[in-house]
């Protein structure tokens, strides 16, 4: 749930009446609208009636984006920090950003989808209506990444994205900072910044704190075996990699960023995606001493010849040393490491840029 990913213990429940606007939950719905739009465009090739449905989903995405990126002191996007936060709204009209640097602030990146030229041509009425809507309501276009005539990227690609270029750079500068989100083993669910700077929130006379906890949770929430305050979770890492690849199809080599932050090492977004995938893969590989980070201090699994080569797909992983934590049979989502190995094993940046998304699933 959104309140889990945000890293704090549903403190909003103790602030009744009042409600929480969740940046991650809103981003999920924006991504859902994009996915449904893509499917409707595919179906419209065979049944034109689906073009109206595609128009509906495009409109939903734009309205969600306007709500999420609204300018103001109480919106989800904090222009000063260059980051997204959940917002707690109270009956008196006041609002408080819950300034936890968590996965909540990264997930808006995931609502990103490139629009190929052939897709626009397949639904000309939708394309025309969208551009007309931008003309009549420029605030819609201003709330998302620039797109449309004069704003197409590589190979005339358009883009539907919640996060524009300037915000993208600011969010990535935190995400790729090894003192914040970037672990040797992937992207942490909570910034390491909170190890030295815990977030404190008061509700009805009680303090709620969010500390960086790279391993097990220190609360009984959700059974006590779920922790979004520092560990590495494979499914959200995979979604972030997907988003970076979408942005790369639009920008190509015209967008580069330091990875890691302050290293001086400039990468395009395909290279950044591959770097994160390599770090996730490192969880399961033997290090120079022959030990696999995934097995942590479990000596039986590390050294016993009958066990050491039989990998376990844990629920999540220690944010600093990569050790597996939680259920050890979470193959459904932790198994995503396998297609990441496959995709980056056969795909290079140029082939991907020229061939588009289909190239990721082609061999030879």
Give names to the regions the model predicted:
Residues 1-364:
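Acidic, mature catalytic/reactive cores of soluble proteins
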């Amino acid at each position: 749930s959104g309140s889990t990913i945000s890293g704090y213990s549903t403190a909003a429940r103790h602030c009744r009446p009042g409600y929480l606007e969740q940046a991650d939950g809103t981003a999920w719905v924006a991504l859902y609208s994009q996915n449904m739009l893509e499917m409707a465009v595919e179906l419209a090739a065979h049944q034109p009636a689906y073009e109206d449905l595609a128009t509906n989903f495009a409109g939903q995405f734009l309205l969600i984006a306007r709500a999420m990126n609204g300018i103001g002191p109480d919106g989800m996007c904090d222009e000063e920090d260059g980051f997204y936060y959940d917002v707690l709204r109270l009956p008196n009209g006041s609002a408080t950003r819950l300034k936890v640097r968590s996965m909540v602030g990264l997930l808006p990146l995931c609502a990103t989808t490139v629009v190929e030229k052939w897709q626009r041509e397949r639904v000309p009425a939708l394309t025309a209506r969208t551009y007309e809507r931008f003309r009549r309501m420029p605030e819609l276009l201003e709330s998302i990444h620039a797109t449309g005539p004069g704003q197409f990227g590589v190979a005339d690609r358009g883009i539907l994205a919640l996060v524009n270029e300037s915000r993208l750079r600011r969010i990535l500068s935190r995400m790729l900072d090894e003192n914040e989100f970037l672990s040797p083993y992937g992207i942490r669910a909570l910034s390491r910044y909170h190890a030295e700077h815990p977030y404190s929130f008061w509700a009805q006379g009680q303090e709620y704190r969010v500390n960086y906890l790279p391993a097990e949770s220190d609360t009984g929430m959700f059974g006590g075996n779920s922790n979004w305050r520092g560990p590495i979770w494979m499914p959200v890492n995979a979604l972030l990699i997907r988003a970076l690849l979408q942005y790369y199809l639009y920008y190509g080599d015209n967008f580069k960023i330091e990875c890691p932050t302050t290293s001086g090492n400039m990468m395009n977004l395909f290279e950044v995606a591959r770097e994160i995938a390599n770090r996730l893969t490192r969880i399961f590989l033997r290090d120079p001493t022959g030990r696999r980070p995934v097995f942590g201090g479990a000596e039986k699994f590390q050294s016993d010849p009958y066990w050491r080569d039989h990998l376990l797909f844990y629920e999540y992983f220690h944010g600093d040393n990569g050790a597996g934590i939680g259920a050890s049979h979470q193959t459904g989502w932790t198994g995503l490491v396998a297609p990441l190995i496959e995709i980056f094993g056969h795909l290079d940046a140029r082939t991907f840029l020229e061939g588009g998304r289909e190239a990721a699933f082609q061999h030879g």
